[in-house]
Amino acid sequence: NSELINAILGSPTLFGEV
């Protein structure tokens, strides 16, 4: 499921720095 990974990696709020 690339959608899940893309959603997590595409979430600037998850890292905050990115």
UniProtKB/Swiss-Prot annotation:
Principal place of residence: secreted
Family: Belongs to the arthropod PDH family.
Keyword Secreted: yes
Subcellular location(s) per record: Secreted
Protein name, as recorded: Pigment-dispersing hormone B
Record's keyword terms, sorted: Amidation, Hormone, Neuropeptide, Neurotransmitter, Secreted
Function summary: Causes the migration of the distal retinal pigment into the proximal end of the pigment chromatophore cells and thus decreases the amount of light entering the retinulas. May also function as a neurotransmitter and/or neuromodulator.
GO biological process: chemical synaptic transmission; neuropeptide signaling pathway
Organism: Faxonius limosus (Spinycheek crayfish)
Valine amide: modified positions: 18
Tissue-by-tissue expression: Eyestalk sinus gland.
Transmembrane regions listed in the UniProt entry: none
A Gene Ontology molecular function term of the record: hormone activity
Any Gene Ontology CC annotation: extracellular region
